[in-house]
């Protein structure tokens, strides 16, 4: 059975042996149905982002020209990352990974890349969009195509992503990721 990446993320965070803490990213996009500020993202406006940039707190920033306007996603050096001996977990793009790696150092940032077949990704995206009060299928398609380009084989190689996990067998994938994380702490 397949699982959504966010479900795997949650399972990893709940695994006490891994001692992972969640990093919550920031965004300027509107909150979606079912989201809570400070849980999936910190939702903020352009003014707050400008202040964080001015203070040098933004580690990485990505802007997407969406059907509804420009949405920004970013990671902030804030109260969340206090102890560099602690292990943290964050869902991000290859671009975000590269900037975090540059900011904290290659030895401190380890990518966990989970592959999901395109048809399954598209089905899930449609399902999520259907649950919105006002579905924006055009934007969903734009995001799907942008993700395909952002995570192309060439970009994975450029980012030096050498270890990948297939999102197929629930238990096996979970064990493989868990073992990989534990091996990084040795």
What are the residue ranges of the model-derived segments?
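ATP-dependent small-molecule kinase phosphotransfer cores
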Residues: 27-88, 92-94
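Conserved phosphate-donor/acceptor-positioning beta-strand/loop module used by diverse small-molecule
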Residues: 87-93, 104-128
